[in-house]
Every structure is written in C-alpha cells, then in structure tokens.
C-alpha cells in the first residue's frame, strides 16, 4: 500500500537497483506540480500529528477540486514498470486500495490483474488521501492505507508461512497481529521525515538507517 505499492512492483519485476535509484534521485518537483505543493505541506503537518481526523476537511477540499495531480507519478510508472514483465515474474505481487467514497477494500494479486490494468492497480494503492482517485473498472480508488497500512494478516490469508513487515510509523490503519509467531516486524530506529516530502538526501539517510535496522534484526 501507499509508496510501498510502487516499491514492491519494482522489486517484484526484478528492479531493485531501479527502486534505489528512484529514492536516491527523486524530489517533489519530479512528482508534483507547483500548484499542489501547498497542500502537500498541509498533509505533512497533519500526518505528523498522527491524526486521521485532522486530514478530513483538507482531503475533502482537495477532492472537490479534482485532487492532487498524479500524472507525473503515472508517467514514472509507465517509464519504469513493465506490466508483462511484472506479471511473468516468479515473484508475486499484491496490493490494497480503497474504493471512494464507499471505503470498501480492493485486495488484488497478480492473478487478478491484466497487462492493461497493472499500472492502475499500483497507482490506486499509492493514491494518498487527497490525490486524484485512480479508476479501475467502474470505481474510483485511494490509498490502501485507509484500510490496512501494513497488511501482514492478508499475506497470512494468502498462504505465506512467514511475514517480515517493514514498519514506517506513519499514516494509516494498523490491525493487530493475528499470529505473532509468523509475523516479524522491523521498526525504524529514528524518525523518517515528512511523509509527503521527497528529498534525495533524506532518502539516502533512511536507506542507510533501514539497512542497519535490518542487520540488527537479523
């Protein structure tokens, strides 16, 4: 879900280096228009308060105006994710999005997708509240974090024997662990920075921190 939907798609198609390059080189200007920067800063301030209710009115206002433009994010997906390659990869891929305004979850894996709608599924799962909803079929979808920001239980339902969950301590709904023996979690040792601020220097710091946090976990 959220940015994890994009990370996971790149990893599932075998492009770990491309995923790292994305984080080490991408800034807000590469993904968002000048007109949307003010609203992004509002999101950063309110998500940092860790309150879903604080976002409600601004999300409503953004969506009434069409939502934050996601065309640059879609362009990145089109340039970097090969639908056929992803679907044929031996690594499975799953995502969650939430239908808007019904707030009903869509949980899908590669077996549920086609080459024509793979990118729609990835973008839908990454469409943070306040972004333009992504259309799949006859429904509009937003970030799956509105339903489950760390879907370890869904992976157990899907048949995984063990789940290693990378936690971000950020936006979204977190459900209780269903099986503590099968689910292990890695938490960041320090704050990661604002959720909607893409900055190469911060990203490189977080990648290094994630490496050491994982090594301690192992």
Residue ranges and their predicted role:
Residues 1, 9-218:
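Patatin-like phospholipase
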Residues 4:
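Gly/Ala-rich beta-loop-alpha elbow adjacent to hydrolase catalytic centers
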């Amino acid at each position: 879900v959220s940015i994890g939907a994009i990370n996971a798609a790149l990893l599932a198609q075998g492009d770990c280096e491309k995923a790292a390059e994305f984080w080490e080189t991408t800034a807000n200007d590469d993904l968002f228009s000048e007109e949307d920067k003010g609203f992004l800063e509002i999101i950063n301030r309110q998500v940092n308060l860790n309150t879903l209710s604080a976002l409600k009115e601004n999300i409503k206002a953004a969506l009434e105006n069409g939502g934050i433009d996601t065309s640059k994010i879609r362009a990145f997906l089109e340039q970097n994710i090969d639908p056929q390659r992803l679907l044929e990869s031996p690594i499975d891929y799953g995502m969650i999005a939430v239908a808007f305004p019904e707030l009903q979850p869509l949980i899908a894996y590669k077996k549920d997708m086609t080459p024509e709608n793979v990118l729609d599924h990835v973008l839908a799962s990454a469409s943070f509240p306040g972004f333009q909803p992504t259309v799949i079929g006859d429904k509009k979808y937003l970030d799956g974090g509105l339903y489950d920001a760390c879907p370890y239980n869904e992976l157990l339902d899907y048949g995984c024997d063990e789940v290693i969950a990378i936690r971000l301590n950020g936006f979204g709904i977190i459900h209780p662990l269903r099986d503590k023996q099968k689910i292990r979690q890695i938490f960041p040792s320090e704050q990661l920075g604002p959720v909607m601020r893409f900055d190469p220097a911060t990203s490189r710091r977080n990648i290094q921190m994630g490496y050491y946090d994982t090594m301690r976990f192992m």
